[in-house]
C-alpha cells in the first residue's frame, strides 16, 4: 500500500486512522525530539563509567554459526562491547592501513567478533580477561588479534568496525542499495538470522 512507504519529505499521519486509542494516536505522531507535535523537555541519561583499563580483541571464527554461538557465550561475561563482522564486511576494509595481513586470506565463511572489556583496575581487567577467555575456550578460531591493552591497536581494531559501512557502500555493485537498518534476533536465533541475512 503506497501510504505505508517511508516518506522522508513529509509527515505520515497514518496513526490518525490506524489507531483508535488517543494515547496510541499521539505516541505514533511524535517524532523523536524534533518537535513534531511535541518536544522533549527533559532527558535522563544512565551512563556507564569510562574505566581506565580496557582490552580489545578481534576473534575470527570459521563460520557465522560458531561466531554467533561465541557471541551468545559472551552474553554472561564482563564485556563492554561485542560487534559481529561477517566476511563481506571484513573484505571491504582489508586494505586499510594497520590491519593484519592475514585478513586477506580468511576463508569465505569467516565471521569475526570485535570484543572489548573495561575495568576499574589492571587486576580487575586481568580477572575479566581470564573469565572471557575461559568462556570462549571451546570455540575454534581461524585467526585472531588477541586481547590487547595497547590503545593504538585498539583504535585500529575499532576503525575496522567504523569503516565497514562506507567501505561496503563503496564496493557494492552499481544499481544496488545499501540498507543501514538495525536488525535484532533473540539470542538463541542469532546464528540462523545472520546466516539467512547473508
Where are these regions (language model features)?
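Noncatalytic alpha-helical scaffold of FAD-dependent oxidoreductases
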Residues: 1-198
Amino acid at each position: 500500500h503506497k501510504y505505508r512507504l517511508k516518506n522522508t519529505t513529509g509527515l505520515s499521519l497514518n496513526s490518525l486512522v490506524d489507531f483508535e486509542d488517543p494515547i496510541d494516536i499521539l505516541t505514533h505522531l511524535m517524532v523523536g525530539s524534533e518537535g513534531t507535535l511535541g518536544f522533549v523537555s527533559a532527558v535522563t541519561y544512565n551512563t556507564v563509567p569510562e574505566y581506565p583499563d580496557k582490552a580489545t580483541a578481534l576473534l575470527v571464527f570459521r563460520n557465522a554459526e560458531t561466531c554467533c554461538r561465541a557471541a551468545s557465550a559472551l552474553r554472561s561475561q564482563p564485556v563492554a562491547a561485542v560487534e559481529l563482522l561477517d566476511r563481506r564486511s571484513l573484505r571491504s576494509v582489508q586494505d586499510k592501513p594497520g590491519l593484519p595481513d592475514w585478513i586477506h586470506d580468511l576463508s569465505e565463511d569467516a565471521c569475526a567478533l570485535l570484543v572489548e572489556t573495561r575495568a576499574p583496575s589492571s587486576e580487575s581487567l586481568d580477572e575479566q580477561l581470564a573469565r572471557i577467555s575461559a568462556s570462549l575456550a571451546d570455540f575454534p578460531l581461524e585467526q585472531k588479534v588477541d586481547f590487547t591493552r595497547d590503545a593504538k591497536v585498539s583504535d585500529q581494531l575499532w576503525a575496522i568496525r567504523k569503516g565497514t559501512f562506507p567501505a561496503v557502500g563503496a564496493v557494492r555493485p552499481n544499481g544496488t542499495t545499501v540498507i543501514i537498518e538495525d536488525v535484532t534476533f533473540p539470542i538463541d536465533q542469532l546464528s540462523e538470522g545472520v546466516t539467512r541475512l547473508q
